Amino acid sequence: MASDFLPVHRALLSVSDKTGLVELARVLLAYNIELLSTGGTATIIREAGLPVQDVADLTDFPEMMDGRVKTLHPVVHGGLLGRAGIDDAVMAKHGIAPIDLLIVNLYPFEQITAKKDCTLADAVDTIDIGGPAMLRSAAKNFARVAVATSPDQYPDLLAELQAHHGQLSAEKRFALAVAAFNHVAQYDAAISNYLSSVSDMHTTLPLRHEFPTQLNNTFVKMTDLRYGENPHQSGAFYRDVHPQPGTLATFKQLQGKRLSYNNLVDADAAWECVRQFEAPACVIVKHANPCGVAVGTACSDAYEAAYATDPTSAFGGIIAFNRTLDAVTMQSILDRQFVEVLIAPYYDADALAYATKKANVRVLRIPSTGAMNRYDFKRIGSGLLVQSADSLNIHSGALKVVTQLAPTYAQQRDLLFAWHVAKYVKSNAIVYAKDNRTIGIGAGQMSRVYSARIAGIKAADAHLAVTGSVMASDAFFPFRDGIDAAAATGIKAVIQPGGSMRDNEVIAAADEHGIAMVFTGIRHFRH
């Protein structure tokens, strides 16, 4: 089959997206391909002055039920499913002519149901029946039929026709068939997800549950990975069929080696953390934990402060910025340390030119526009956990001062900064911060007080003074020992969720040490 080229004599076009339709029809006619079509598609082709036969004339059966029935006919499906050399006699007996090319895209179900005023009746009316049936018939018979589902496929399809004088290769037909089955599967998944989410069908606008009774997600493989988290594991990177703009899956790699599994995990943590800041910021991540974060007036000073938090851990890290990366900062990074991945929304031309001096460094560009991910997914044994994303940020007006001392303006600014960082540190998470930069980070300890001690050790190792700093904790302190440990290192203000049975003891400890403390009422566990 590898060298099996088949000529296209007859094509059926029935599309909801009319993009490129007339141009496509003209090229097909130039190769003497007979055109069949339905409804509005046929009208547009005919209005362009091009010859086309209505499917209703072919089947000798009119479109009916407001277009619900128009292609569900043996003449159509026989023309798509008939096997060359096997079904020829049967097709001739029943007057069925082969259809060699099918161009169909489906009713826009996802776009219609995304509208706030979409009723259940609107959704049901947008469920395509004839289109998927034809796509499946044509794709099943890829040995003789080619099928396209999107205007994005037209250029390659026409290029193949032109290169082979009106013929299509077996490889092209098979690739198009796979794409068609994937398209139908995605379409059916969207219908299932929508209908499975309807909790009350009797209201004017159907009440929908956030989590459907059956969840069908579709992902597209972007690349195979050298290996998974460890060399003995295999791995691949998939992205959502409709990725959220501004998220990691939309990256463009500008230079460097192939990304690894761990690169992608760390890059996602770094990018999600840095894009929450409004001012120029830098986040350095190692093993999915921030090891240095800072906000500055420019990328250069943000990087310098972030790096100073933990230079040892920054070695081989992933560095992300939320502003255009300039040449000065690029040179500072590459001359100072080994870095696996750099991420920014844009790069100066001089910065990219300097990056070529370290050709193995992976340089990613991700436009920062777009909302954060709406949901998080985590696999467990034979199961999937789904939750709304931890996207809730707090502002100064929502902080509850619970101690005798209230934080100063500068402390309040640093508390909110540290709180934003703590959200991206593995629990139990403790962050020491001062002047919009991290001083020490304690991550992933089973005991919160040990995370606090580690944050202090990190600060001491980096020769950063903790005295006068603030502390953020991703969850409440169950005992006063965490506050006692913080006071011993010189912490002067604390931000935490509150909610412990011993909050009064913890507050009393803060008052004893002259520490200002605020409650957020929000927890930021991260596992």
Curated annotation (Swiss-Prot):
Q: Where are the transmembrane segments?
A: none
Q: Which SMART domains match?
A: AICARFT_IMPCHas (SM00798), MGS (SM00851)
Q: What is its EC number?
A: 2.1.2.3, 3.5.4.10
One Gene Ontology cellular component term attached to this UniProt record is: cytosol
Reaction it catalyzes:
(6R)-10-formyltetrahydrofolate + 5-amino-1-(5-phospho-beta-D-ribosyl)imidazole-4-carboxamide = 5-formamido-1-(5-phospho-D-ribosyl)imidazole-4-carboxamide + (6S)-5,6,7,8-tetrahydrofolate; IMP + H2O = 5-formamido-1-(5-phospho-D-ribosyl)imidazole-4-carboxamide
Q: Which SUPFAM superfamilies match?
A: Cytidine deaminase-like, Methylglyoxal synthase-like
Entry keywords, A to Z: Hydrolase, Multifunctional enzyme, Purine biosynthesis, Transferase
Name the pathway it acts in: Purine metabolism; IMP biosynthesis via de novo pathway; 5-formamido-1-(5-phospho-D-ribosyl)imidazole-4-carboxamide from 5-amino-1-(5-phospho-D-ribosyl)imidazole-4-carboxamide (10-formyl THF route): step 1/1; Purine metabolism; IMP biosynthesis via de novo pathway; IMP from 5-formamido-1-(5-phospho-D-ribosyl)imidazole-4-carboxamide: step 1/1
**Top-level taxon of origin:** Bacteria
One GO term in the molecular function aspect is: IMP cyclohydrolase activity
Q: Where is the MGS-like domain?
A: 1-149
Q: Name one GO biological process term.
A: 'de novo' IMP biosynthetic process
The UniProt entry, under Pfam families, shows:
AICARFT_IMPCHas (PF01808), MGS (PF02142)
Q: What family name appears in the similarity comment?
A: Belongs to the PurH family.
Please give the HAMAP family that the UniProt record associates with this protein.
PurH
Q: What is the UniProt domain comment for this protein? A: The IMP cyclohydrolase activity resides in the N-terminal region.
Name of the protein described by the UniProt record: Bifunctional purine biosynthesis protein PurH
Q: Which organism is it from?
A: Xylella fastidiosa (strain Temecula1 / ATCC 700964)
Q: Which gene encodes it?
A: purH
